[in-house]
Amino acid sequence: SSFEKAGQRVRLPYSVIEQKQGTCIDLAVTYASCLEAAGLFPLIMIKKGHAYCGCRLEEETFADCVIDDFSAIDKRTVRGNEDILLVECTDFTAGEKIDFDRAVKHGKNNLSDSENFICAVDVRRARAGGLRPIPQKIDSNSICGYDGTVASVSDYQAAAPKKLKIG
């Protein structure tokens, strides 16, 4: 991943796994894609200078795909009333043995810094709103669409419009 003038480039999950490297946002997106593939309800958590992942424990979504209200997230992580489980994804690569419970503790600790909270992205709500995943690369000549169909790269290129009209 690289920093741009505004934002940051994010590696696709297959690149993170293939290259065995990634920034916090790369790891959060990869983990969220694994949660979604398992039928769970991922949240990508973004705070100033860092990203990590969460998961809704109940089958429901927020009203919008981007949640910038800290209290809407925080109140769902209170012990005994937990609807969201947070995970520090960089713990999976820290080089030392960090178990899942500790990664969850570190994920929850990230939320204790309300001043630096930017937003959470509710992936399930985004899907309900029509946002689809980027097709995943199978090999250099074919990709798999979000619906599981496999097509050659040339098929996707042929289907792309020759020119986009904006405005």
Model-predicted regions and their roles:
Residues 1-167:
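A structural boundary/capping signal
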